[in-house]
Amino acid sequence: MARQFPLEKTRNIGIMAHIDAGKTTTTERILFYTGRVHKIGEVHDGAATMDWMVQEQERGITITSAATTAQWKGHRINIIDTPGHVDFTVEVERSLRVLDGAVAVFCSVGGVEPQSETVWRQADKYGVPRIAYINKMDRMGADFFRGVSMIADRLGANPVPIQIPIGAEDQFKGIIDLVTMKAMIYTDDLGTTSDVADIPGDLVDQANEYREKLLEAVADTDEELMMKYLEGEELTEEEIRNGIRKGTIGLKFIPVVCGSSFKNKGVQPLLDAVVEYMPAPTDVPNIKGVHPETGEADERHSSDKDPFSALAFKIMADPYVGKLAFFRVYSGVLGSGSYVYNSTKGKRERIGRILQMHANHREEIPEVYAGDIAAAVGLKDTTTGDTLCDDKAPIILESMQFPDPVINVAIEPKTKQDQEKMGTALARLAEEDPTFKMHTDQDSGQTIIEGMGELHLEIIVDRLQREFKVECNVGRPQVAYKETIRRAVKSEGKFVRQSGGRGQYGHCWIEIEPLEQGSGFEFVNKIVGGVIPREYIAPIGQGIEEAMQNGIQAGYPVMDIRATVYDGSYHDVDSSEMAFKIAGSMAFKAGAAKADPAIIEPVMKVEVTVPEEYMGEVIGDMNSRRGRIEGMEATGTAQIVRGFVPLSEMFGYATDLRSKTQGRGVYVMMFDHYEEVPKNIAEGIVAKRAGA
């Protein structure tokens, strides 16, 4: 089968936004208009095609990024619908990594909400060109122009409207296209029929004002256009469109369109904008990587002729075909049944079938080309972020970084059968989601699961019950405390065991010192003159790392330290790797106790939006939770309070906030950094762990 759509006519886009700005509804409408769905699914009916997990349909939120493909005006658009809830940031992160462009959906009433900022920063990090779509223009309090100025103020972006609305709230009738200077007025409910008319008289001045701003932005992208514009010549429609495309792809500005997806208004012009202004795989820079053996920089061009390279960005357990690996092809061609080389793991794997996904129904295809997004069956060893490539031209593409979990709960299976199933089920879920981790607590023998927030873990437990039929009891959420040291010390570890036959001998001197937050663990070898043979150096590091897992004061993992081994001694006969591992562990324990140890806790960035009359109460409550207020701002009738609060003080906050504000307050929080726990609280934590 030859390529259906040329690379220039392929668009890989994501739909990203705050919860409830209408991402999934917008995607549903796109699928309806491009002929992929014959009946529109509504999120609030639990029937949206993209929200295919049971948990999503019940909660009306999108958890996993469903990938689907649609066609519009001779172009193929691969769409990834991403979740807006902060606990699922990992899904947004991995989607943005493999996209070429994104549609950022904003609610015309709420404008730029906290999660929009997080997602926006993630898109900035990957340099993803964007179109802003201001949705819900039919809602009470809709204000397109306020939305535009919020994008400029709160996101520091340069928004340029290429449309303006005709009316707002229940008077929202259509849109004015500032490129053609025509009005598009909707005449039926499905938004499939619309009349193109002249601009209503009362909006002519406003349309001219915004067209002038658009022309200015377009002229800025190109010197010839700038000269033409400054000399007062009229720019042609084609020149304007080319200028918008150039400005968007070059990240100079963000074109802004508007509509009401629920009322089917503005979705086709949004699709036109995606096709006209979003980059094709050939418009974005070549994908960078390194050669797995030499470590030298390498790259691949978006072309079918280059050697095959792809990035696996999501692993999913599927009830019918087993493990599905979603991947984005950057270069080359791949046929089903062929072998690929997983350069991250150093393994050859066979691709069984290649599927093109439409939310949760799938179509088998014989091969994929550069620029495609598809799912493969049969990749047993591949996990998120792995590179798949041609083994004759190996490359490791830049992967993604995922944050460490900040919250954990203990779970116990209800029966013996559940016990066996639970291990396999958790391993499958951990494969799908890199921010979900699990381990067994050494002391209690309990299984501990860790994640990015309460909702994240709730959904994991829910999936255990539904998909894997594992019934389990869940403990109270616990904070992922860590320990660290505050000053550098030198210490000795000596392990000598002399019993009949061969003895054990390991001896080392180490220096441990604190590092900056987020540095992890560094192990440095400064042994000279062979006082400790080379083969015993690594075991010392392993011994230190193992001791770090068991903490200093309260048994929490130790982070952000550098350990340097600088002296020691060995015995020709009695020394062994095991003896030096124990010596390393002993040296760390002896030193850490004298290094002014401290317990540190995750601190969350919190934003609370409340009506003005509850401000005092909310600020007082935040202070009582050891919070630090960073700032406040007014938006319409509400106030936003921003601050940092330790995670341990935030459990149950949703209920408290609801009762304090009569259900009118909302909040979001995301992990920000670790901070030292105050002495009185640290003592309580140590005592509790000792008592446990």
Swiss-Prot record:
SMART domains: EFG_C (SM00838), EFG_IV (SM00889)
Residues holding GTP: 17-24, 81-85, 135-138
Localization per Swiss-Prot or TrEMBL: Cytoplasm
Molecular function terms from GO: GTP binding; GTPase activity; translation elongation factor activity
This protein's GO CC annotations: cytoplasm
Highest rank taxon of the organism: Bacteria
Keyword vocabulary terms for this entry: Cytoplasm, Elongation factor, GTP-binding, Nucleotide-binding, Protein biosynthesis
Region of interest called Disordered, as start-end residue ranges on this chain: 285-304
Basic and acidic residues: compositionally biased ranges: 290-304
Any Pfam family: EFG_IV
Domain spans labelled tr-type G: 8-282
Main subcellular location of this protein, as a coarse class: cytoplasm
InterPro entries reported for this sequence: EFG_II, EFG_III, EFG_III/V, EFG_IV, EFG_V, EFG_V-like, EFTu-like_2, G_TR_CS
Gene3D superfamilies assigned: 3.30.230.10, 3.30.70.240, Elongation Factor G (Translational Gtpase), domain 3, P-loop containing nucleotide triphosphate hydrolases, Translation factors
Coiled-coil parts of chain: none
Entry-linked SUPFAM superfamilies: EF-G C-terminal domain-like, P-loop containing nucleoside triphosphate hydrolases, Ribosomal protein S5 domain 2-like, Translation proteins
An individual GO BP term: ribosome disassembly
PANTHER family: RIBOSOME-RELEASING FACTOR 2, MITOCHONDRIAL (PTHR43261:SF1), TRANSLATION ELONGATION FACTOR G-RELATED (PTHR43261)
Chain's role: Catalyzes the GTP-dependent ribosomal translocation step during translation elongation. During this step, the ribosome changes from the pre-translocational (PRE) to the post-translocational (POST) state as the newly formed A-site-bound peptidyl-tRNA and P-site-bound deacylated tRNA move to the P and E sites, respectively. Catalyzes the coordinated movement of the two tRNA molecules, the mRNA and conformational changes in the ribosome.
Family, as annotated: Belongs to the TRAFAC class translation factor GTPase superfamily. Classic translation factor GTPase family. EF-G/EF-2 subfamily.
Protein name: Elongation factor G
Native source organism of the sequence: Desulfitobacterium hafniense (strain DSM 10664 / DCB-2)
